[in-house]
Amino acid sequence: MNTKLNDFKKKIKNKKVAVLGIGISHTPLISYLYRLGADITAFDKADEVKLKSTLEQFKGMDIKYSLGEGYLDNLKGFDILFRTPGMRYDIPEILAAKEEGTEVTSEMEVFFELCPAEIFAVTGSDGKTTTTTLIYNMLKEQGYKCWLGGNIGIPLLSKIEEIKDTDKVVLELSSFQLHTMTKSPNVAVVTNVSPNHLDVHKSMEEYVSAKKNIFRYQSAEDRLVLNFDNDITREFAGEAKGDVVYFSRKTVLEKGAMLKDDMLVFRDGETETEIAKASDIVIPGVHNVENFLAATAAVIDCVDRDVIRKVATTFTGVEHRIELVREINGVKFYNDSIASSPTRTIAGLNSFKDKVILIAGGYDKKIPYDALGPVIAEKVKCLVLIGQTAPKIEKVLRDETERSGKGSDIPIKKCTSLEEAVKVAYRFASVGDVVILSPASASFDMFKNFEERGNRFKEIVNSIEA
């Protein structure tokens, strides 16, 4: 019996509960808390018209709403407040509620308190979703009952009564979710850390500190998987309480998952096990080799080597990640909409042997783009720019040309929409070319999220007449 869950049910019944944000994760949360007998008020900055289809799901439930402009004005008198991950924990309204005695938490924080199963969790600036999905697939292929959640999969708190202590839970966690966490998973994976989300985090130091919460509360029995090739994550080992296992594409390790020639290998002291050939991995790019190494290090104690090998050679990737959309008259179109940072776009560009036509630009997260300039100069034959960050990306290429003389012959096309960008890219392309949407920027200046951006790109490409 899950006594913690029973205690939570008693605690929540008849309590005044505020849920901030009526998004994908909070829709099932609201329904679940209502079933437990909570007195719920749901808050959202969107108005009733924009939320119409979502609110219809709560028809027949006695739920109160505070919507639109000034929606947080009445955040008073609540026992418990569930914060959406994208909202900072220290805004004045939340601080005032805490001062009044309201318990402030989040869906993920409560889930960690109640979950009876072993938790594998992944964070990092890039590669989170692919690595999380790989771990999930490896565990599932081994025969475990698995649950996939966090940033992907389903909101798991509403499923907590179905999760058994013999199951495995696999989570993708962002810095926003981790920021206020006071529990860590049994197995924590940090794929890499580079500047990101500095439009929300007050500094790089705050961003890194949030990431550290994935292992900060571990015990000696837990495992921390770190990228040895990343300067920031390598240093995390000094603060770890549990068993540290590295992965590396560039270095031979005493203990960990590594690439030796073309072979993915796991070494533990004198024992070395060959897992799979890197050339057999279906999805392209050296960054995906790193993702496989990270996943291998996470599951090596509970998944057979042949199972890991099978997943390595059959996994075809995740949508919006160097996803081949279509080939038209010898021109291949790839959707890499997930690339919301320069490091992610660099990895995407390095996945191709020949120069590509790059569509880039979008919402400005206030992060540096300097590292992107040399890679564009080396790997791009035409640069098509859209969105707020277009001037930044153009500048780093021009700076690189001034510094090294490279990239001076790359045409730069500025467009006002994704539709125009695709048309311009296709007009420039010839047989054998690759056109890739890899924005190096978030999507919020034009789209709700990277999925909507990627889906729109696919719609545009699929509407082109051959």
From Swiss-Prot:
Q: Which gene encodes it?
A: murD
Which GO terms of the molecular function aspect are on file? ATP binding; UDP-N-acetylmuramoylalanine-D-glutamate ligase activity
| Recorded catalytic activity of this chain's protein | UDP-N-acetyl-alpha-D-muramoyl-L-alanine + D-glutamate + ATP = UDP-N-acetyl-alpha-D-muramoyl-L-alanyl-D-glutamate + ADP + phosphate + H(+)
Which keywords does UniProt give here?
ATP-binding, Cell cycle, Cell division, Cell shape, Cell wall biogenesis/degradation, Cytoplasm, Ligase, Nucleotide-binding, Peptidoglycan synthesis
List of residues binding ATP: 124-130
Could you say which residues form the signal peptide?
none
Entry's localization field: Cytoplasm
Q: What is this protein called?
A: UDP-N-acetylmuramoylalanine--D-glutamate ligase
Q: Identify the Pfam families for this entry.
A: Mur_ligase_C (PF02875), Mur_ligase_M (PF08245), MurD-like_N (PF21799)
Q: What is the lineage of its organism?
A: Bacteria, Bacillati, Bacillota, Clostridia, Eubacteriales
What is one process in the GO biological process aspect for this record? cell wall organization
**What is the similarity comment for this entry?**
Belongs to the MurCDEF family.
Could you tell me which pathway this protein works in? Answer: Cell wall biogenesis; peptidoglycan biosynthesis
> EC number(s) for this protein?
6.3.2.9
Briefly state the protein's biological role.
Cell wall formation. Catalyzes the addition of glutamate to the nucleotide precursor UDP-N-acetylmuramoyl-L-alanine (UMA).
Which InterPro entries does the UniProt record give?
Answer: Mur-like_cat_sf, Mur_ligase_C, Mur_ligase_C_dom_sf, Mur_ligase_cen, MurD
Q: Name one GO cellular component term.
A: cytoplasm
Q: Where are the transmembrane segments?
A: none
Give the domain of life. Bacteria
At the top of the EC hierarchy, this enzyme's class is ligase
**Gene3D superfamilies xrefs:** Mur ligase, C-terminal domain, Mur-like, catalytic domain, NAD(P)-binding Rossmann-like Domain
